[in-house]
UniProtKB/Swiss-Prot annotation:
It comes from Campylobacter jejuni subsp. doylei (strain ATCC BAA-1458 / RM4099 / 269.97). This is Adenine phosphoribosyltransferase. The gene is apt. It is found in: Cytoplasm. It comes from the Bacteria. Gene3D superfamilies: 3.40.50.2020.
Length: 182
């Protein structure tokens, strides 16, 4: 499997702005907009992901709202694959599957159209998001893909916040690849 060298990871990491104490004190926010408007770094990332996934025999790429949409759509364009959105509740106009997950204070849901994978049983799906932290959204998204009769062959994240252990939880269900380990 194709992975980046430490030097290549540093190159990408250096293209992401760090904002301390956002959205609240004690949080270190990773602002991907600086990567998105750096065409050299963005093209480097997309070339890497295209190389990694070109031989996975994927049928679809699913992205989670909202920043997962950005990366998933671009990977779809590079691999000539259809995009499937996994959205917050009430945003999809047709019949949906939904999955609830826990937050630090409360819970939330994600939804997926029931026919998102065109009723192709065991369709091979790559799940994409910008970041995995505690794993709640990612695990719920994985479960939605399964509910729709498809198979999540890997979950791909730009960043994994290692200390929050989400990738380790998700790895019990599917393969996980994080471009950057933070």
């Amino acid at each position: 499997m194709i992975k980046l060298t430490q030097e290549e990871q540093k190159y990408l990491l250096d293209s992401i702005r760090i904002i301390p104490d956002f959205p609240k004190k004690g949080i270190i926010f990773r602002d991907i907009t600086t990567l998105l408007n750096n065409k050299e770094a963005l093209n480097f990332l997309l070339k890497h992901l295209k190389e990694r996934y070109k031989d996975y025999n994927l049928d679809f790429i699913a992205g989670t709202e909202s920043r997962g949409f950005i990366f998933a759509s671009m990977i779809c364009a590079k691999l000539n694959l259809p995009f499937v959105p996994i959205r917050k509740p009430g945003k999809l106009p047709f019949e949906t599957f939904s999955c609830e997950y826990d937050l630090e204070y409360g819970s939330d849901k994600v939804e997926l159209h029931k026919d998102a994978f065109k009723n192709i049983q065991n369709a091979r799906v790559l799940l994409v998001d910008d970041l995995i932290a505690t794993g709640g959204t990612a695990i719920a998204s994985y479960e939605l893909i399964q509910k729709a009769g498809a198979k999540c062959v890997e979950a791909c994240f730009l960043m994994n916040l290692k200390d929050l252990n989400g990738a380790n939880k998700l790895e019990k269900l599917t393969s996980v690849y994080s471009v950057l380990e933070i």
